[in-house]
Amino acid sequence: MVFNSVVFLFCFLPLSLLLYYLVPGRAKNAVLLAESLIFYCWTGVAFLPLIAVLIVFNYLWALLTARAKAKLRGLLPLAAVLVNLGVLVYFKYANFLIDTVNQVAHLGLAALNIGTVLPLGISYYIFKIISYEVDVCTGKIAPEKNFITFAVYVLFFPQLIVGPIVKYREMADQLHDSANRCTPARAEHGAELFVFGLAKKVILADSIGALWTDIIGAGGVGLTNVSTPLAWLGIIAYSLQLYFDFAGYSEMSNGLAALLGFDCPANFNLPYISGSITEFWRRWHITLSGWFRDYIYIPLGGNRKGQARQLLNMFLVWAATGIWHGASWNFIAWGLYYFVLLTIEKTFLLKYLKKGKVWPHIYTLFFVVLGWGIFTANQPGAPLGLLLQKLFVPQGGISPVYYLRNYGVLLVLGCVCSSALPHWLWEKISKNTVAKLLVFALLTALCVCYVVAATNATALYANF
């Protein structure tokens, strides 16, 4: 069940909010846990025992860690991290590793019978759990003694599908203040966030994404007959689709959290206006970047042990970033691609980028869009080699004119909406209450029309 589906918007959401608001404060966490369990099990209960065991194990393990003697204080969380990572590796990467070993060593190992469907949200809730265990070990937080409260943190349904990856310490105060966390101001902000995110997802992402789908499906032969201009048009469309899909879903997540009384960190901050790759990654998937910084980069020494060690740490972080996104070599290549770009910037380029005005933005957009070409290279019909050939070796083929005629306005709208202009306009509109309510109502109605007319409700980043 995704947030842009009819069943969520017209059944689950209103009923869950109504019940949540009606119960007294002391019962809100229990109700929220029940609602999160229903949400998690909506498409099946096959993986419910898995997440239940993980919640119980990590709840008890953190309590044990806090009481352990100093000699064991570092070993216990390490064991917890290995257990949780082991679960993630088994479900997400085991068959990829087996296939890789078979190709390299020709061993003929049999693939594991674990299916192709990942447990819902496993990449996100495993990282939340690991951050909790590490923070308990380092004394940044005390272990949660209330089992229901801890279970709500792990299962919190607004964050189950695509995050954001919120640390326990960022939610703890509100988890414990169930009587006062729901306020009219927070609910109003949550409704705005949710509708704006829904608009990005169903009006922009899904509509622009149809262009990329049409291009790689042209003639049933993928990119084979696509011209160079059309290949660039397609990868630009995919870049916009991915941004609006993920940023929109993240906004919906934070909007739902605010409706439930929680303030969660933003996951995006206009990444396509960045003037460097370094700045881009401060604006894109902020909570994932922060997680790798806090739990891998800094513990390894960060930039405190010389440039060579810093580059090694960066290599490990970006290899892990690529691997986190999926069990495929194109994701690993994508992560290392950014390692190379960031290394170049840190070594000498960043100081020149800071002096420029226009060219740093062009440079950043070019390499980010090219990066999305690597990212999407496992899609049928768009192998990386063929895509790069189409992009950089001028070729004739299917003209972009037809696609520009059908999608040109959408592409322009997408470019405008990925800038700071919509935020500025909303600030101006918000000064007039009547205008604000009217625009909000119209946008909500338009989103509802798109949702009802849609034939397939998905979220791209739910696959990671």
Where are these regions (language model features)?
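Membrane-embedded transmembrane alpha-helical bundles that form the catalytic cores
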Residues: 1-463
